[in-house]
Amino acid sequence: MLGREDIRTYQVYLANEKKLAPGSIHIALSALRFFFNVTLERDWAPEEVLPLPKKPQKLPIILSPDEVQHFLGCVADVKHHAILTTCYAAGLRISEAVQLKPTDIDSQRMVVRVEHGKGQKDRYVMLSPKLLEILRDYWRMWRPEAWLFPGDRAGHPITRYAVGQACVKPHDLSRLSKPVTPHSLRHAFVVHLLEAGADVRTIQPLLGHRSLATTAHYLRIATNKVCATESPFELLPRPAPTPPPSKPQYF
């Protein structure tokens, strides 16, 4: 059986020789855990021998409302404009947006039905009146039937890859320094709601998050929440004014 030093040597090899990120090292050690626990049926976990490296928690780069509007204004293709606007306006994952059907758009109740979201759970999200107008204009032009956003293959929805590629040209035209992807539009949806005063518990079901902590993570990014909190430095008494320097004796 592998010992502590064997695992340590392997981990150092992955980090220093292979130059793997902490997430990739997690995967490698998880494979070892599976091999021992499942294949060999031995109760052993790498983290009991050696602590797993911590994954760096990077905050996503958030587009401002003006940047979102500018980017979407650069999307010339009607279908691409409609689906990317849907990702932002409804806060959908790209995997959810491509699976939408025309019948999922409920203009009577002003909601969008999301079937089999992450975790295979259905949910409803808000339908913006402005989004409804864009979708209606798109529908009049395309007349989609089975899928709201059909792909190049008959009977299949547009692929996630195609939607990702649809961001490339508009991003170049927009000259935005920040990266833009379908998922960054979802990030922007969350942060803009928080900055507008929406409650985390209200946003959680819209995103389809199981845990409130996942949604609360975005509070670290909502800048108005940070800026609205006064620094304790402002509470310190101001120092007495410094007296002006004395006038030189001869001039």
Curated annotation (Swiss-Prot):
One of its GO terms (biological process) is DNA recombination. Pfam families: Phage_int_SAM_4, Phage_integrase. The keyword DNA-binding applies. The active site is at residues 93, 118, 183, 186, 209, 218. Residues 58-231 form the Tyr recombinase domain. Residues 1-40 form the Core-binding (CB) domain. PROSITE patterns: CB (PS51900), TYR_RECOMBINASE (PS51898). Disulfide bonds: none annotated. The keyword RNA-binding does not apply. Keywords: DNA integration, DNA recombination, DNA-binding, Plasmid, Transposable element, Viral genome integration, Virus entry into host cell. Gene3D superfamilies: 1.10.150.130, Intergrase catalytic core. It comes from the Bacteria. Belongs to the 'phage' integrase family. This is Putative integrase/recombinase y4eF.
